[in-house]
Amino acid sequence: AMIKTSRLETGVISLEQKQQPVYDTLAAALGGILLNAEKKQIDVQVECPEHLDARHDRKWTSEALFNILDNAVKYTPAGGQIHVSVEGWEMYVKIDIADTGIGISEQHQGTIFKRFYREDAVHDVDGIGIGLYLAREIVTLQGGYIWVVSEVGKGSTFSVFLLRK
């Protein structure tokens, strides 16, 4: 993750945005988390139209979505749920990743996207605090944005907005 972040920031990596289905990009991201979700008996549900396109770089956007999904698995207790839903808006495609995890306090919701940030409550969970930073950088470089709504003890919903055209 560190090398990817460095390459992205220095412009070594260029994002190749093209009009393509979000379905395939999301499927690649989900492929990276399903085994760990299964180990924790987390129910992963996905609602995504097959033919909904957005202008994005498939490889890097998949990486961004994976980072958010990976956190959802890490911070959702065994037996919990992750629900992914995708819908087309006029200018954006909105991808919601909702979990029944530990949640993020309101005071920390603005800082979770900072590089190396880790909330004190999660220091026993593996990670270096760069996944959400990298996810936001990737999405922002493509003209999109990420929004989070969370409640401690109830879970979080990360909304990723990608430009349709």
Regions found by a protein language model. Name each.
Residues 143-144:
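Conserved glycine-rich
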Residues 72-73:
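Short helix-loop "hinge" at the ATP-lid/N-box region of the Bergerat-fold HATPase_c
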Residues 79-91:
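Short beta-strand/loop element within the Bergerat-fold HATPase_c
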